[in-house]
């Protein structure tokens, strides 16, 4: 597909069937911000960073110190599928009824999602990067455009996509959703990163692997080391994005939200989920 700028009356026709998306209004409104950016850091445990927060995420702290940081905000679920529905609607799970992947339950049409509300306000709404968990159950309703990559949703791609989108649609008031999973601990299904195997003792690198779902992972040196290293890497990439935003927008022209859908068991102080 392609985007075409249309400034005069045009007629589009073809001998073959074709699809035309909804038009994108190229205008700003003083009633809106030029950008509202919603960033989901999958599995990021704010409490899990503990006293190392300043060392792990200096760019995040620097940027959001100009706004509001909530230290006591907690998820309503232990994994993404039900948590995302709550995030997008503001409703507890007993209202959304969305609990388990594979169960064919769709969000009731009477519940309005955040992108549906933003679209009603005139924003061009784009799901710039996500795993697609809210597509079929309706939790991600309302986006004009969705770019979905199952599992492979690294922050480096999300940041670059976001910047390129903003440069392409700079004449719009944009609402963007970016989801990355670098901060999510994984188990034996994922190879050990080189930086971990190069620095940790051999016994930690070759520890018996738990092949259960990562939400059940118990605290261990390898998972903790990798998770903190990935958090540090995410902060570097987000610092690049934040520098771009502050260089191209005035303070009152944008809103950025950074949040997580759940914590992680690898930093837990107890053996309970």
Mark where each language-model region is.
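Catalytic domains that recognize anionic headgroups
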Residues: 1-273
């Amino acid at each position: 597909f392609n985007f075409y700028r249309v400034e005069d009356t045009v007629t589009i026709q073809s001998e073959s069937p074709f699809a035309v998306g909804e038009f994108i209004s190229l205008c700003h409104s003083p009633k809106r911000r030029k950008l509202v950016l919603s960033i989901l850091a999958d599995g990021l445990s704010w409490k899990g960073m503990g006293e190392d927060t300043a060392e792990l995420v200096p760019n995040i702290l620097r940027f959001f110190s100009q706004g509001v940081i909530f230290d006591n905000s907690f998820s309503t679920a232990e994994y993404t599928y039900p948590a995302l529905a709550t995030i997008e609607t503001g409703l507890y799970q007993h209202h959304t009824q969305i609990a388990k992947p594979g169960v064919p339950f769709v969000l009731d049409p009477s519940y309005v999602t955040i992108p549906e509300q933003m679209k009603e306000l005139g924003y061009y709404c784009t799901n710039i990067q996500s795993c697609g968990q809210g597509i079929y159950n309706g939790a991600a309703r309302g986006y004009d455009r969705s770019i979905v990559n199952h599992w492979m949703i690294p922050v480096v791609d999300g940041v670059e996509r976001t910047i390129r989108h903003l440069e392409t649609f700079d004449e719009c008031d944009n609402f963007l959703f970016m989801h990355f999973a670098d901060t999510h601990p994984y188990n034996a299904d994922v190879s050990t990163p080189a930086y971990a195997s190069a620095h940790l003792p051999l016994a930690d690198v070759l520890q018996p692997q738990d092949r259960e779902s990562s939400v059940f992972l118990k605290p261990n040196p390898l998972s903790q080391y990798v998770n903190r290293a990935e958090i540090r890497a995410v902060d570097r990439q987000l610092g690049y994005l934040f520098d771009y935003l502050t260089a191209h927008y005035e303070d009152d022209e944008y809103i950025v939200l950074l949040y997580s859908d759940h914590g992680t068991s690898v930093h837990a102080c107890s053996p309970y989920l």
